[in-house]
Amino acid sequence: MRDSVFIYSPSYQTYMFHQEHPFNQQRVLLTYDLLKTINAFDDGDIVTPRLASEEELSLVHTDDYIQAVKLAGAGKLPAEEGESYGLGTEDTPVFAGMHEAASLLVGGTLTAADWVMSGQALHAANLGGGLHHGFRGRASGFCIYNDSAVAIQYIQKKYSARVLYIDTDAHHGDGVQFTFYDNPDVCTLSIHETGRYLFPGTGQIQEKGSGKGYGYSFNIPLDAFTEDDSFLEAYRTAASEVAAYFEPDVIISQNGADAHYYDPLTHLSATINIYEEIPRLAHTLAHQYCGGKWIAVGGGGYDIWRVVPRAWARIWLEMKGIDPGHEIPPEWIVKWQKQCPVALPSSWSDPADLYPPIPRKPEITEKNAQTVSKALYAIRSEQQRTK
């Protein structure tokens, strides 16, 4: 058994809406190249993804939607019909070959799932995945097919496993949550910026599931301008208590890197420090409850130069137990600086004065603590009753 595998293909770059679109898969290449530069890969660590089949996509997505995506990518879907499927919008424009490009990202997460669930590897990372806004019959928020949702259904069908999905993207993991809203064998936890200010506007504490799945959806909507300490306190508390409550067979973590202060689309005030702690706890919980079974995917993250490579590299470094030291390799900076519109960071950490002090910090911290308490009230009440 390998400790970890890294699912990667240069073809991930084909998932490209247009040059000005904020969703840019060059960030996966930048992360891969940073890890390669610090010699973080052993022989056999890199695994090529496969294409997801239409049958696999249909574990989540409707047949008519899959056909619409194929037609759109071939330039044969009328614009009005495309919009009814969320295709051809400002968020999710049509591009040539979009079905194949999106199927490869899903196939990457399925590849990761098979490596982990078959016992070939303890951990697997597919940073090209994490497209958590995709719905059964509709594209949304840059996401065509929902790789995590397809992988969870695949794992349940093939391996009969209970799945804990932990999402730390700044945007609510709506597509995954609502796919499994009535499923008691899938527990979703999303820690995100409140939907009062940010797409998709969902992810309230009251969204707890339905039917047999009631009580297996957890949401921690954080206030705008939340900083490291408050974010990590919410994450540690919620992830630890939810994992203990659900006792999963495998953990899938979605690792959006858009809670950072630099991110142009969100309003949180985290630094790179949280992206060292987030995978560390996921790793610990996987060994505590799942025999180590941990699948990590990417997600959001729109400062593709200064934030995403360092944040996502930390996932692989945690899996492999590698300490990268303090400095980013100068040769990586030299290689990419000419393409980068801002100065690339020279350190794995952020400076202490990254941004000016947040005036509402005590109020924000207290509000977030109350949110966590409300979200976990049912778990804690059950624990009190069974003592």
From Swiss-Prot:
InterPro entries: AcuC, HDAC_PDAC, His_deacetylse, His_deacetylse_dom, His_deacetylse_dom_sf, Ureohydrolase_dom_sf. Pathway: Ketone degradation; acetoin degradation. One of its GO terms (molecular function) is histone deacetylase activity. Gene3D superfamilies: Histone deacetylase domain. Keywords: Acetoin catabolism, Sporulation. It holds the Pfam family Hist_deacetyl. One of its GO terms (biological process) is acetoin catabolic process. The keyword Nucleotide-binding does not apply. SUPFAM superfamilies: Arginase/deacetylase (SSF52768). PANTHER family: HISTONE DEACETYLASE HDAC1, HISTONE DEACETYLASE HDAC1-RELATED. Role in growth and sporulation on acetoin or butanediol. Involved in the breakdown of these compounds used as a carbon source. Belongs to the histone deacetylase family. This is Acetoin utilization protein AcuC.
